[in-house]
Amino acid sequence: MANNRSPITEQRRIAHIADALAHEQGEYTRLGEEVGIVGAESSLEREGMVILPDIDGPNEGNHSGDIYAVAYDEDSRPRSLHVVAAKGYSHRLRTRPVDGAYATQGSPEYARHLMLTDRCLHAALAKDPVLRRGILDGSIEVIADVYRTPRPYMSSVIHPSAIPVPLDRAYASTLQSIVRQHPDYTE
């Protein structure tokens, strides 16, 4: 059967299909991010962690983390801060330039970068002197985590990595000076 469409009509049809595909790919990405966040939050809460409120999450700018969660000991004292990269479906971990090299989400380098640049985290640390002091003096461990939710079922959450994030004195001093400038800072 011969195609009776003109080349112009065929080009328009292909352009329309391409636009629709681009829209659907964007929607797939957005839904994957939502599935990743919901899966990671659900898993973190099942593990007994408390998610820091008012964190912007994915796609809120290049300097914001997906999730920050705090694990507490049996006496309700903060034990660790988790800097979480949450991935849904088959989304890959992203990289970004950090100090002249590329750092991958879920790595200690990436976590340290986020901690210096994420204003929402700065606000949370400014309001919580116990958490802030513990991070700065090293008594509260910082951990870079990756949580993957490959399917939209909470039972499918995978936690492939949890890596300690070392913070030296110079880094702690820099973070302290950034957080201290926040209007909600309390001693």
What kind of feature is each model-predicted range?
Residues M1-R5, I67, D184-E187:
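Non-Sec secretion/translocation targeting segments of pathogen effectors
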Residues H23, E27-Y28, V38, V50-E60, ...:
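Catalytic cores of nucleic-acid endonucleases
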Residues A2-N59:
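Acidic-basic catalytic patches of nuclease active cores, encompassing PD-(D/E)XK
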Residues S64-V70:
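Short acidic loop-to-beta-strand element that houses the catalytic metal-binding Asp/Glu
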